[in-house]
A protein has these predicted regions:
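N-terminal export signals
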Residues: 1-21
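Short, charged/polar, Gly/Pro-enriched secondary-structure boundary elements
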Residues: 2, 322, 361-365
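Binuclear metal-dependent hydrolase catalytic cores
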Residues: 6-9, 22-248, 257, 331-361, ...
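Short glycine-rich anion-binding loops that position phosphate/pyrophosphate groups of nucleotides
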Residues: 228, 275-276, 391-392
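Cap/insert and terminal regions of metallo-dependent hydrolase folds
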Residues: 237, 243-246, 254-352, 442
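A polyampholytic, Gly/Pro-enriched intrinsically disordered region
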Residues: 363-377
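Extended, charge-rich low-complexity interaction segments
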Residues: 375-404
Length: 451
């Protein structure tokens, strides 16, 4: 049936339509650029988001191609995943480079060493590792480094800095002592050799209760720490201050007032993130929703809380790491942050590179090969760090094989002449019970054994 509308009704309908059209055409309200930037600048990007002086390629970071200036900080995320292990994400580790000569590491999770080597950091120079707490996803690659760094030329102890625990048995020192025991089969093989001291660990264990205490103060670099609420006593956060620049890594834990206090106005604020969607999170983790809720609610910082905490801190750049970076959840994670924090925010996922000066910040991704080998430190570095700048010309060493292997099993080795081409036979490095070695040759400054 055809329904006829009178003039009055038609006028009312037209009025409603006009009102709806006017509402649709109203300018957007509520969101403005947090920094007062002009049109075309976005709503969260600051005017200081610009390449820093050392940046040579604005799109990607190519290792060894960009020496840092004396007033610049570079932060590289070498790992960003708590659990489960992923091809795209190693365990949490953040490398901070300061100017021309200083490098520190914050946490050292499983798989991070692969990324550090891919970034062409010489293995002997991987040192000064700060642990936020003693869950394995924050230090599991230390034993791997510990075994091979002396082989690669670090003949002095590995330096590890971390918190005490409620008891001595639960602190960083105890963990490192047990790791040395675990690796005794490896370190024993270096007995009597120049690299033997490289299997020692120099532990700086600070009192975790000393909020605001200084655990590192060298060469103009100061690192302070404070407690975090995460699973057990001992979890800590760090703030690094150097040359007017600053960096915070909270480690794991619930959002807290101490972090808001000690991280205030930091240049780069990095915290962890757990997506507060319990059923989905549990599904992806392979656990029950109960376990999911229990874990998030008691141990971690929800994505909403990341923004809340960042708003209290007011950094120049806020970042989240230690998060499973699921692409379909990027919008949700960002929306949660944006509820409370309107400033510059980014995810610190594997290979993320952040350059920082006092007036600029720039973020890129490192361009790395799938296969990479080890970069060597300079001979000058090895002489300075292994011998204090004065390298001896020769050293007397004892063969470690005599004490570590029964001669009977060595006697069963097949003669190399039976399988090696004649023109490829060389003098095999068979050590007598005691011998003198040329240190320059041993470090690689001389020649390899001749044929």
């Amino acid at each position: 049936m055809l329904k006829v509308v009178g003039p009055a009704a038609a006028g009312m309908a037209a009025g409603v339509a006009s009102a709806e059209a006017a509402e649709e055409n109203k300018p957007a309200t509520g969101e403005t650029n947090a920094y007062g930037a002009p049109p075309g600048a976005g709503i969260s990007m600051p005017p200081y988001y610009l390449p820093t002086p050392s940046v040579k390629n604005r799109n990607n970071y190519f290792p060894q191609s960009e020496p840092l200036g004396p007033d610049e900080m570079r932060i590289i995320f070498m790992g960003s995943q708590p659990w489960p292990p992923r091809l795209s994400q190693a365990g949490t580790c953040i490398m901070v480079e300061l100017g021309t000569s200083k490098r520190l590491f914050f946490d050292f999770g499983p798989g991070c060493l692969r990324n550090i080597i891919a970034n062409q950091v010489p293995v002997p120079e991987i040192n000064d590792i700060f642990l936020t707490h003693l869950h394995l996803d924050h230090y599991a690659d230390i034993p791997y480094l510990w075994q091979f760094a002396p082989f690669n030329g670090r003949w002095k102890p590995l330096r590890v800095i971390g918190p005490s625990g409620r008891t001595a048995a639960l602190g960083t020192r105890a963990m490192c002592e047990h790791m040395e025991k675990m690796g005794a089969w490896t370190s024993h093989q270096a007995a009597g050799m120049p690299m033997a001291d490289g299997y020692e660990i120099e532990v700086t264990e600070f009192d975790f209760r000393d909020d605001g205490g200084v655990c590192y103060d060298k060469d103009g670099v100061k690192v302070t720490h404070w407690r975090r609420s995460h699973a057990a006593d001992g979890a800590s956060a760090y703030r690094l201050d150097w040359n007017g620049l600053s960096f915070v890594w909270t480690g794991d834990g619930k959002p807290d007032q101490l972090t808001a206090k000690y991280a205030k106005n930091v240049d780069v604020f990095v915290t962890e993130m757990a997506v507060d969607m319990v059923s989905l999170w549990a599904l992806k983790q392979g656990v029950s929703p109960y376990i999911g809720a229990w874990t998030i609610d008691n141990f971690h910082t929800m994505h909403y809380a990341v923004g809340y905490l960042a708003n209290l801190v007011q950094p120049r750049l806020a970042m989240a790491t230690h998060v499973s970076f699921d692409r379909e959840l990027i919008g949700e994670m960002t929306a949660g942050v944006r509820m409370h924090y309107k400033g510059m925010f980014a995810f610190g996922i594997d290979h993320t590179v952040v350059n920082v000066t006092k007036d600029r910040i720039w973020i890129r991704e490192a361009a790395l090969p799938e296969t990479s080998n080890v970069a060597r430190p300079s001979m000058e570095w090895m002489i300075k760090n292994n011998f204090g700048g004065n390298m001896p010309t020769e050293m007397t060493v004892k063969s470690p094989f005599l004490a570590n292997q029964e001669q009977s099993i060595r006697d069963l080795e097949i003669d190399p002449a039976l399988f090696t081409p004649k023109d490829q036979m060389r003098q095999w490095a068979r050590m007598p019970a005691e011998m003198k070695i040329d240190i320059a040759d041993f470090l690689g400054g001389g020649q390899a054994p001749k044929k």
